[in-house]
């Protein structure tokens, strides 16, 4: 194992200057096998007193500080211009929002902007329950893990366990951000919705730190992002939670936000997927925010519903955009984790009356 590790290091992109090998004579040890002792030679050519690389003269390529500033600024501003009028805005980059973005981004013609108020996307999906590491995923959502290439322990017939929730979150986030049609705006908060003629048409944004300090500062007007579809995946109630549906109630587009009920895992996950829908024209609600608007039970530290709800929201958005989708069967190949009954659960008559 030591030889393999050393060989991998020597073949890596580690950018030091390799020193000459300091090969020592093989050592001899006596090994007892229960019978006559035998002598085994151990090579020490890999492990020497000198390190394999010398970094005393290491040097990066030179760069001007202004170039760094210009690269960051130009690219970010280009993204803001591109997504000032975009196809889909996803509000919240938790497990449901990222799953939605992953599914949407498979269509390279759909431009997707993800707005996340935290510096670090992922929501509550970096850990399991009570700050533990493992992520429990009920079947058949494990098929989504298979699609992503996330390893898991086949713990039982009904569920699987990912050894650390961060494995899922980092994998799906990396896959999403690698797609050229997706941009993540983290540390950006959504302060309001754009509504025209009874239809949600985008979001009102601001730097998250500015949003948190409106009471102490003035003259901090927001920015806007127009979108053909807004997907609200803001999570359950809290300081920054369920903000999409709460704003709909404030402006009279829905009657009430009853809040989620007490925990019932079996009822909750099915309900969240089944009730993921376009709640008002132009706005789809996914993830735990669904439980808030429908008074469904909370589900606790299981994550399968977040993944499938996010995927379903993506196909509802594709339908709204007039693109091939799984809801009306116009897409030839669907992620195997999307069960037919979950897709069929989304009906036009589920739209909440304004």
From Swiss-Prot:
- What functional role does this protein have? Involved in biosynthesis of the thiamine precursor thiazole. Catalyzes the conversion of NAD and glycine to adenosine diphosphate 5-(2-hydroxyethyl)-4-methylthiazole-2-carboxylic acid (ADT), an adenylated thiazole intermediate. The reaction includes an iron-dependent sulfide transfer from a conserved cysteine residue of the protein to a thiazole intermediate. The enzyme can only undergo a single turnover, which suggests it is a suicide enzyme. May have additional roles in adaptation to various stress conditions and in DNA damage tolerance.
Q: Where in the cell is it found?
A: Plastid, Chloroplast
Under the heading InterPro entries, the entry gives:
FAD/NAD-bd_sf, Sti35, Thi4_fam
Supply the EC number(s): 2.4.2.60
**Which residues in this protein are found as 2,3-didehydroalanine (Cys)?**
219
HAMAP family from the entry?
A: THI4
Q: Give the primary localization class.
A: plastid
- Protein name from the UniProt record: Thiamine thiazole synthase 1, chloroplastic
One Gene Ontology term from the biological process aspect of the record: thiazole biosynthetic process
What is catalyzed by this enzyme?
Answer: [ADP-thiazole synthase]-L-cysteine + glycine + NAD(+) = [ADP-thiazole synthase]-dehydroalanine + ADP-5-ethyl-4-methylthiazole-2-carboxylate + nicotinamide + 3 H2O + 2 H(+)
Which family would the database say this protein is a member of?
A: Belongs to the THI4 family.
Q: Spell out the Pfam families in the cross-references.
A: Thi4
Q: Which GO terms describe its cellular component?
A: chloroplast stroma; cytosol
The cofactors it requires, by name, are: Fe cation
Transit peptide, residue positions per record: 1-43
| Residues that hold substrate according to the record | 96, 116-117, 124, 190, 221, 236, 288, 298-300
The record's free-text note on cofactor binding: Binds 1 Fe cation per subunit.
